Amino acid sequence: METIGISRSKCGCFFSIWTVYRKLTLAHSSCTILSALGLRTMPATVVLGAQWGDEGKGKLVDRLAESATWVARFQGGNNAGHTVVLGDRVLKFHLLPSGITREECGLVLGDGMVIDPWVLDKELNDWVQGGGKDPSGKRLFISNRAHIILPYHTYIDGLDKKIGTTGRGIGPTYADKINRIGLRFADLPYCDFNEMAARQNKALEHAGCRQRVTAEELEEQISWIQNRFGSAITDTGILLDNALKMGDRIILEGAQGCLLDIDQGTFPFVTSSVTSRGNATHGAGIHPGHVDTVIGITKAYITRVGNGHMPTELFDEVGEHLTSVGHEFGTTTGRRRRCGWFDAVVMRHSNRVNGFTEIALTKLDVLGGLDEIKICVGYKMGDVEINEMPASAIALEDCQPVYVTMPGFASHSLEEWLGIARKCNSEGLGFSGLPAAAQNYIQKLESILGVTISSVGLGPDRDATVDRV
């Protein structure tokens, strides 16, 4: 079988295994003891978006990473956008796992990802300029099985606006992967630059793109990637497997959300990867038996960026309230997010696909100040009421939401919400320290979904989260 763009006339190796692990904390030393005794441990937590993305995964992963040894991404690329707020600092990541804020936490860009090396370099430089240390090859490792986004991928992606993609080259790179002509980090030493240039120019011409590439440009680009990231490229599946055998706690950080999943989302208005639980361990290079917790992240309302129908979308003053108070603009593109009431039909679908063991509810504070709050509990298609999402995006356009209505609660400033969260946690109040109407809203969601809500977000700050007690 012909392998396009790869020559076996060259050799090279970029394996770099982290041989010195940090001292194990008391939090996971018990897992290490169990492992040494030959007892089964499952020290992996999966964090997934349960809606159309932008649910607040970065903030949750940042909190969880405090007691984790590794945070690994397993799919997507720089089409993701994760935000972490540390005091006055607002950190926005597109490729780096959100655990980067924890200096003792190892970071992995896993097998299932597509990675733009130039974007990664800029993100690392921004991190260093902000006072951080460059983790490349020290605590940041790149899977040698991950595929590389090259400039021609972004040229092609910029031509198609019908789906409403981020234009970052994600789709074309995954297309090359499926067509078995993509370039992985493991293949960097074996590139045939003339053949690569010929193939890429043919693809550019076919797409109607004016740009062209040369073998010399490609050779320079590949050489730069090797020099910049060579020490970080390794078999991260082996690295994570060894860590799990030691009893280390690993967080598998999802990007986008279940409704953007290529198989389970609102096709064709989806991303190009599998964003759901089934791909978490596969895309990280470990087996699924390691997972003991699956956390679904959902806003207290719902948002969507790009094209495709959203049944509960609001075009009135309530929609404006959610947009302005929630600061609903995309981390990656800056695009205004469409806002709507919480959609339990979407969440039921997401839970069926992912099997959430718990739910983290974010941005409850944004609902403050509304006289009433609605929850979509079903859809009406003509005269028929349904409780599940239709597979067809066209059929979804015919769905009208069926609501239950609940009383609202008072608004507070972000500082006041932060104070409420800190009091709830420091005094062991849990959700009982929240406004009564907010408590009722949480209980109603749990009753509808049949899944426990383990935490509630009351603002962007790291401490503005109330944990269930």
Where do the language-model regions lie?
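Ser/Thr/Pro/Gly-rich low-complexity, intrinsically disordered segments
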Residues: 2-7, 32
